[in-house]
A protein has these predicted regions:
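Short, conserved loop-to-beta-strand elements that form functional interface hotspots
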Residues: 146-182
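RNase H-like nuclease fold core
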Residues: 64-98
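Mid-length scaffold segments of soluble, non-membrane domains
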Residues: 103-108, 112-114
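C-terminal segment of N-terminal export signals and the immediately downstream linker at the start
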Residues: 25-55
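N-terminal secretory signal peptides and thylakoid transit peptides that target proteins
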Residues: 1-17
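Phosphate/pyrophosphate-binding loops at sites that engage ATP/ADP/AMP, CoA/4′-phosphopantetheine
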Residues: 118-125
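Beta-strand elements of well-folded, non-transmembrane domains
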Residues: 80, 135-137, 188-192
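Short, well-ordered beta-strand segments in beta-rich or mixed alpha/beta enzyme
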Residues: 72, 76, 129-138
C-alpha cells in the first residue's frame, strides 16, 4: 500500500480510496467497527454507572425522533429515570447548579436512548451537531452555560471530542412541561444502517 501523505494530497489533488488500496479494507470492516463502537458506547455508559435506559415516551402529540437523510433530530428530552421526572422546580431556587447539571446529563442519556431506539445501533452516530438547552430558572439567573455543561461534558465523555463535541444554545425560561427544571433538544449526524 502506498504511503499516505498530506503533501501528496495537496500537490496531486484528490486521492481516492481506491488509489490507496483501502476500498476492500474499509468496506469489509465498516459494519464490524460500527458494532464495536455501539458496544463500546453502551459499555462506557455502564462503566459510568449510567446504563442506557429504555427510551422515554413523548409527553405530548409528537414523535420522539425524526430522521432526514443523515440527520437525526431528537425532540426535547426531560430528566426521566425509570418513568419518573427527577428534577422539578427552578434553577436558582429549589434546584442548584449541580442538580441542574445532573438533570441535563440524564436528558443527554435519554437522547442516546432515543437514538438507539431510532437507529438500532449507537455506532451509527457520526457526531452530535447541536444541542439546545432550556432551563427553568429564577429572574436574574446568569449561569445557564454552567448548567448546560452537564450535557456537553457528558456527550464528550461518552463519545469523545470528535463525535461528542457540538455547537449549542441555552436559554432561560419561566416554565417547562410537567414542571421540569431542564429540557434538552439534540441534533445528530448519523450513518446509514
Amino acid at each position: 500500500m502506498r504511503e499516505f501523505s498530506r503533501r501528496r494530497v495537496m500537490k496531486g489533488g484528490v486521492v481516492t480510496l481506491a488509489s490507496l488500496g483501502l476500498i476492500g479494507v474499509l468496506g469489509s470492516t465498516k459494519s464490524s467497527l460500527q458494532a464495536q463502537e455501539s458496544g463500546d458506547i453502551e459499555q462506557r455508559l455502564r462503566d459510568m454507572g449510567m446504563p442506557l435506559p429504555k427510551a422515554p415516551k413523548p409527553v405530548g402529540a409528537y414523535v420522539a425522533t425524526r430522521k432526514s437523510g443523515n440527520l437525526l433530530f431528537i425532540s426535547g428530552q426531560l430528566p426521566f429515570a425509570e418513568g419518573k421526572l427527577t428534577c422539578k422546580g427552578k434553577v436558582g431556587q429549589e434546584i442548584s447548579i449541580e442538580q441542574g447539571q445532573a438533570a441535563f446529563r440524564l436528558c443527554a442519556l435519554n437522547a442516546l436512548a432515543q437514538a438507539k431506539e431510532n437507529l438500532g445501533d449507537l455506532g451509527r452516530i457520526s457526531g452530535i451537531l447541536k444541542i439546545v438547552g432550556y432551563l427553568c430558572c429564577v429572574d436574574g439567573f446568569v449561569d445557564h452555560a454552567k448548567v448546560l455543561n452537564g450535557a456537553s461534558e457528558f456527550f464528550v465523555q461518552v463519545l469523545g471530542m470528535e463525535k461528542g463535541g457540538h455547537t449549542r444554545m441555552v436559554m432561560g425560561v419561566q416554565s417547562l412541561p410537567l414542571g421540569t427544571a431542564v429540557a434538552l433538544e439534540v441534533w445528530m449526524e448519523v450513518t446509514e444502517g
